[in-house]
């Protein structure tokens, strides 16, 4: 072989190696929560396809169930093998603030600041977090969508029990008694079915349980932290409010008004019980319950009869509503949870990761993604809330009305240690103390407050 031939092969080999390396650098690893239904995932896939076509970057997408996302991400952080971009429905509740504090997240201010004015109040602010390693606050996450608490009930089950929607009380105590003391026994007597008045999430491994409980707490006007994140748990009014909320919440189980299994429910389980008509009503932090039937109605793989029944369920038989008035008679208050994605400080391809996040948060890309969830998530941008989508049916109008009336934020947006409180789920553990260990409500609250002080003080 001639020297020139050898040189040519060496050059060719070097170019091939360089090309392979360059190609490898143009891959982006993305981890994402799997959607509740097909249309939600399809909307994500479409956004990814558009980004790939625009950028030439190949996205390697991995999707996981909501309950698996945090364990998998924590394991990746420990192993030093993090994805470039990650999103989970419960990051905001349990880990985003802690990761920011520990210096594990990339500063996204260059992406967020130029478009800050397009976001609704109490949305982008929740991603402005303290990094104790860098000793600064910055935008360490990106907001995608938000949720709040709703009531869902079966109109036909209510009617079968002999009641109309106009008979549903608006007062706090009367409202919960109505489903437990009137609807449940009447429905069982009329139908012979052992259905329950309420689906009441109480599982320690469920974000629904603490979101629902905190909504009860809000109606008792309890504030656990001030605007600077300082604990207010030594205020006697806080303890009394928590006692009222915990008693009301656990009384539903004590009266036999929720399935016994609800003490160990995970996030999808109250949905499943509702869809099976095991429960007449449930509270849920999105309208995924109603939207599931809309997704079925649009599912070409189902029979015409199944699709017709799904459409009837969505249009006629399921109602989305707000909570009753507070115990003091004032209007209910709703806390919004802003769903956050992150880029890790240890990500291998941060430049392309930031390009993807910037692309996804553009109005033309974010809005179709949010609407792909069929109303399960509410927008974080002002313009998206004005679209006809949110006036298209009674479920979406109800969601829109709740958000436009104004919402409040979670404690972890002011004190990151409440992500640890929520991750430990001291709220559901207090429920368990009352229900399973038979301790008085006041004792369970005292123990809960002591634990909150130990974690977040």
Annotate the PLM regions:
Residues 131-144, 149, 173-232:
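Extracytoplasmic/periplasmic solute-binding protein
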Residues 176-184, 227-263, 319, 323:
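Glycine-centered hinge/linker elements that transmit conformational signals in sensory
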Residues 122, 126, 134, 312-323, ...:
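Long, aromatic- and glycine/proline-rich binding clefts that accommodate carbohydrate-like moieties
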Residues 27, 58-59, 159, 251-254, ...:
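Conserved C-terminal helix/tail region of periplasmic/extracytoplasmic solute-binding proteins
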């Amino acid at each position: 072989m001639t020297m020139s031939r050898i040189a040519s092969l060496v050059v060719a080999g070097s170019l091939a190696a360089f090309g392979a390396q360059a190609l490898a650098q143009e891959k982006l690893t993305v981890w994402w929560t799997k959607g509740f239904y097909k249309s939600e995932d399809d909307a994500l896939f479409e956004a990814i396809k558009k980004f790939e076509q625009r950028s030439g970057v190949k996205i390697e997408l991995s999707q996981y169930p909501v309950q698996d996302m945090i364990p998998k991400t924590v394991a990746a952080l420990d192993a030093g093998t993090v994805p470039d971009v990650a999103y989970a429905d419960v990051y905001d509740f349990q880990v985003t603030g802690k990761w920011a504090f520990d210096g594990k997240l990339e500063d996204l201010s260059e992406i967020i600041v130029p478009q800050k004015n397009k976001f609704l109040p109490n949305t982008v602010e929740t991603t402005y977090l303290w990094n104790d390693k860098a000793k600064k606050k910055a935008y360490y996450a990106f907001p995608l969508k938000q949720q709040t608490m709703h009531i869902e009930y079966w109109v036909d089950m209510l009617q079968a029990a002999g009641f109309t929607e106009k008979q549903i009380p608006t007062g706090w105590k009367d409202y919960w008694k109505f489903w437990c003391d009137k609807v449940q026994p009447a429905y069982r007597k009329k139908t012979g079915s052992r259905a329950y008045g309420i689906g009441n999430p109480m599982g320690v491994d469920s974000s629904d349980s603490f979101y629902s409980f905190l909504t009860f707490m809000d109606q008792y006007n309890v504030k656990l932290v001030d605007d600077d994140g300082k604990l207010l748990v030594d205020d006697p009014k806080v303890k009394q409010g928590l006692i009222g909320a915990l008693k009301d919440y656990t009384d539903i189980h004590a009266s036999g008004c929720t399935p016994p299994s609800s003490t160990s429910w995970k996030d999808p389980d109250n949905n499943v019980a509702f869809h099976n008509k095991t429960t007449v009503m449930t509270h849920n932090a999105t309208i995924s319950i109603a939207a599931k039937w809309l997704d079925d109605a649009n599912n070409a793989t189902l029979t015409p009869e199944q699709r017709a029944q799904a459409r009837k369920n969505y249009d006629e038989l399921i109602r989305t509503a707000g909570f009753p008035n507070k115990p003091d008679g004032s209007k209910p208050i709703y806390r919004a949870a802003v769903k956050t994605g992150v880029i890790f400080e240890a990500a291998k391809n941060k430049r392309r990761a930031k390009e993807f996040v910037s692309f996804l948060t553009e109005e033309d890309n974010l809005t179709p993604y949010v609407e792909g969830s069929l109303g399960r998530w509410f927008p974080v941008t002002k313009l998206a809330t004005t679209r006809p989508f949110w006036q298209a049916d009674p479920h979406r109008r109800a969601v829109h009305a709740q958000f436009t009336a104004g919402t409040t934020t979670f404690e972890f947006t002011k004190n990151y240690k409440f992500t640890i409180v929520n991750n430990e789920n001291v709220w559901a553990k207090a429920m368990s103390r009352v229900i399973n260990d038979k301790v008085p409500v006041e004792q369970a609250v005292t123990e809960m407050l002591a634990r909150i002080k130990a974690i977040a003080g």
